[in-house]
Amino acid sequence: MSAPRLLISIIIMVSASSSSCMGGKQMTQNYSTIFAEGNISQPVLMDINAVLCCPPIALRNLIIITWEIILRGQPSCTKAYKKETNETKETNCTVERITWVSRPDQNSDLQIRPVDTTHDGYYRGIVVTPDGNFHRGYHLQVLVTPEVNLFQSRNITAVCKAVTGKPAAQISWIPEGSILATKQEYWGNGTVTVKSTCPWEGHKSTVTCHVSHLTGNKSLSVKLNSGLRTSGSPALSLLIILYVKLSLFVVILVTTGFVFFQRINHVRKVL
């Protein structure tokens, strides 16, 4: 199985499971997978509810649990719980969506409800016990499914757009041919819009745009409007008609004026 298909399969499992985080196996209403201790690179779909699990340590052995949260463009946030005094403390934590799953003395896992592009970053849970310290880190990558659309432009080209995806989507064409241009537009929330333009000349009447993305692939087809090759756009045709009519009117006006002035000159000569 290829890497993109494997990742898509993981994302499908993420969206389909429902349970709680137990025994080192993270399972949430929208999100599930198995983690070992250490650092994990984790893709997560935007707008789901995600739970990040601590190392599977029994609460009776817990002394202190600390979550370190490092988000892009923000100061490091720390959420801590001390069992002896049943005290919680937060430092530089301003994101309201990132909270404990429940009371830290009952569940030390962290939840994000729901995930947004601003939650990209590194999360590490550190558990202090009489037997030593244990940690689990997550490199969280938020994925955004792009909106795909395909249309024909006025200059006999096909235009395919993958709007606000994260990461940037890849666009290919069927049948394969020369691509006029592929442009990427970056937005402040980390998403990217990809626009690809393909000439229609030399192709059949139908072309297909194939968009590849970590969240899934999508293909759209469009059939060339045969009238587009000869008559151009409706606006252009209207302008041509108006131009012809105006030209005829000017010719008639000039001819009539010329005849009128000729008659006046003839009458003056007779008098």
From Swiss-Prot:
An annotated GO BP: regulation of neuroinflammatory response
GO molecular function terms listed in the Swiss-Prot or TrEMBL record: signaling receptor activity
Topology relative to the membrane: Single-pass type I membrane protein
Pfam family, one: C2-set_2
Gene3D superfamilies xref list: Immunoglobulins
Keyword Electron transport: no
Residues in the Extracellular compartment per record: 24-239
Disulfide cross-links: 160-209
UniProt keywords, alphabetically: Disulfide bond, Glycoprotein, Immunoglobulin domain, Membrane, Receptor, Signal, Transmembrane, Transmembrane helix
Signal peptide: 1-23
Localization per record: Membrane
Positions bearing carbohydrate: 30, 39, 86, 92, 189, 217
Principal cellular location given in the protein's record: membrane
A GO cellular-component term linked to this record: external side of plasma membrane
Membrane spanning stretches: 240-260
Residue intervals annotated with topology Cytoplasmic: 261-271
Boundaries of every Ig-like V-type domain copy: 46-132
Ig-like C2-type domain ranges (all copies): 133-221
Family membership noted in the UniProt record: Belongs to the CD200R family.
Function: May be a receptor for the CD200/OX2 cell surface glycoprotein.
The protein's name in its UniProt record: Cell surface glycoprotein CD200 receptor 2
Organism: Homo sapiens
Name of the gene encoding the protein in the UniProt record: CD200R1L
